[in-house]
Amino acid sequence: MTADRWTQAVREQLGIGRLLPLGDARDGAWIAERAAEAVLAGAVRRAPGVRLGRLRIALADPEDAEESAVPAPPSALPFGPLRVTAEFAATASRPLPATAALLRETLATAAAQRLGLTVSDVDLRVTGLLDEDAAEQPAGEEPELPPQARAEDGDAGVVAAAARAVPGVLRLTGTLGRPVHLEEVPGEAALTHRHVRLEVAVAADHRSRDVARAVREAVGAALPDRPTVAVVVSAVG
């Protein structure tokens, strides 16, 4: 890899943020923090009289988190309920507690129904009041999907084909390196087995957790040795 390509890869990896757990430890799936935040912010844009500020998603209780049943990708958080923290400004057209309740419900619903995140807490902080004329949310930019990953061959090609055939998969991406990563990992009784990590962009009209689960099943069945599989959702678009 040239210096320019290495620099670009590092920037892309830093840009997607941490990897948030999708589902529970048995699911073996994560979503890029940036992708999850974009979906939640997009849901809030349709809420009347409120403008979202800084948004953050993190483990609600790191000490109570559970390690994944499969090898985790770099920068992946362990599994456990998440806390969404958000700042917002609102108009005075309704009481602030009512606006906060609407915003809390909007964020929690989008996290659960559109992504499949397990959110236990939504913490909000009011940062200011908006004039009625300024209350309209600025139009959000269309999510920029990572570039289509290059074609794979061999077993990686088999994995890629199985993943692309799953409904809801837009493309394979490579922000963490190669789109399909195969490796030998230690198993029980000092035996090794193969592990597959792959990265996908998911359609916005499909629940990310469900797509990731279907990808894991398809990839696991596509190879005769039935490797363990981890799926990273890098973008939702």
State each model region's role.
Residues 1-37, 50-64, 147, 171-177:
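Extended, well-folded interaction surfaces typified by the phenylalanyl-tRNA synthetase beta subunit core
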Residues 16-27, 80-91, 140-147, 192-204:
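Short, hydrophobic beta-strand segments
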Residues 45-53, 115-118, 165-174, 222-227:
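Short secondary-structure junctions
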Residues 80-134:
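Extended, hydrophobic interaction surfaces within ordered domains
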Residues 157, 165-168, 172, 182-206, ...:
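C-terminal interaction module
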